[in-house]
Amino acid sequence: MVQRWLYSTNAKDIAVLYFMLAIFSGMAGTAMSLIIRLELAAPGSQYLQGNAQLFNVLVVGHAVLMIFFLVMPALIGGFGNYLLPLMIGATDTAFPRINNIAFWVLPMGLVCLVTSTLVESGAGTGWTVYPPLSSIQAHSGPSVDLAIFALHLTSISSLLGAINFIVTTLNMRTNGMTMHKLPLFVWSIFITAFLLLLSLPVLSAGITMLLLDRNFNTSFFEVAGGGDPILYEHLFYFFGHPEVYILIIPGFGIISHVVSTYSKKPVFGEISMVYAMASIGLLGFLVWSHHMYIVGLDADTRAYFTSATMIIAIPTGIKIFSWLATIYGGSIRLATPMLYAIAFLFLFTMGGLTGVALANASLDVAFHDTYYVVGHFHYVLSMGAIFSLFAGYYYWSPQILGLNYNEKLAQIQFWLIFIGANVIFFPMHFLGINGMPRRIPDYPDAFAGWNYVASIGSFIATLSLFLFIYILYDQLVNGLNNKVNNKSVIYTKAPDFVESNTIFNLNTVKSSSIEFLLTSPPAVHSFNTPAVQS
């Protein structure tokens, strides 16, 4: 056991470790968000005894856990490691031992993050860690330093993983698997890896300067010494904006596969989908200052960032309409993954529309730092990244585990989280339009109604997550019985471009990507000879 899981160099085992870490961190992050919502359920101090610092520590804990320890490990580390080698017919990733260390620095980062909340009064800086609030004057203990170390460790992990994915995709494709034949999920991980490679060094530079400012008396962000805190914001958001595309692009890849399968049609405009993802990735580097409209940028700078941000809506629109064109006229089967995919389309579009409002520099003067922004990015993350994560889990887990989940329970879980998430985040737009600020644990009585509604929604969503944990348990215990009761996903695959040959176990099935042609669960080493792409 220790040999297999601690020293593992097998991409599939490492992927399972990533999933376990992601589920654990997701539970912790959800618990924090529930405490936040309980505190905000009514005006006045509810649970935190008026401790605003603790409230902000919960906010930063919730944010960092959900972003760096749930979405990225699950979508990139989990699905990426498991499926990318299978889909291109590779034996493993290019650097199996780098893969191992890339995982094992994450638990260390988690330890640093938890420790930072426990020493002194915690890092109450918000996930952006802006100086001067994060400076040694305002946060005197080691909390912020530990949070910076946590971010450094997750950066190292993601960089190593990104290098691994890029080299694997370029060098280890099977015979006949040209770049034009790559499945869309592989493309999405490939593009995400480039984004990580280009943006993370800038974040590391910024937080290292902050570390030096705090402990070694430099003044990068210290006005008294000729520094400028705005420099930190530029460095942080040059990472922070590509980061949100890093979180969602693997989701795009998953949704493409799910929509194709359950409509029984190839994806509409596959090459255009790849170019759209690449354009989104490229443009993501050119728009960072739309997070900073109110720091005193020039009018022409604000005009540029407004226009550039709106241009991102074009490739995003191409993707949405291509998915709709894939569904249109298809033979649609509303299995759980397809429900998540359709919900993703509606809610991600909704989040994108509020984003178009926020892109305007003049409107953002009113919206900045209000709950309108919180509503916007939780629509695209909670109902974009997380819904695609669930879609991918329900789509691939029967193939990965050889065990089926209970379809009826899974659909109940979908409707619970669909209703819950909307009830939480839709009212936040109203609160933001009325000027309720973010990161504040108390508010005037006028905001009480919608906050109460949002807090009820968080209970519904949390209930659905408890149900998901039970579905996992049921899948592992009763998976074979469920397989008899559910029609498995494999018989509804879209007839597409990959022919099976003798190395596959199911010679009758045609599939748009190789992974469903293997045994279920796949062998520890899937391809001892190169797979052949027709």
Curated annotation (Swiss-Prot):
Transmembrane segments: 16-36, 57-77, 101-121, 147-167, 182-202, 235-255, 267-287, 310-330, 338-358, 372-392, 414-434, 452-472
Catalytic activities: 4 Fe(II)-[cytochrome c] + O2 + 8 H(+)(in) = 4 Fe(III)-[cytochrome c] + 2 H2O + 4 H(+)(out)
Residues given in the record as Ca(2+) binding sites: 39, 42, 44, 441
Cellular component, GO annotation: mitochondrial inner membrane; respiratory chain complex IV
Coiled coil stretches, renumbered: none
Keyword field contains Lipid metabolism: no
Residues involved in Fe(II)-heme a binding: 62, 378
An MF annotation (GO) of this entry: metal ion binding
Bilayer topology term: Multi-pass membrane protein
Top-rank lineage group of the source organism: Eukaryota
Subcellular location: Mitochondrion inner membrane
Sequence similarity: Belongs to the heme-copper respiratory oxidase family.
Protein name as it appears in the record: Cytochrome c oxidase subunit 1
Organism: Saccharomyces paradoxus (Yeast)
Gene that produces this protein: COXI
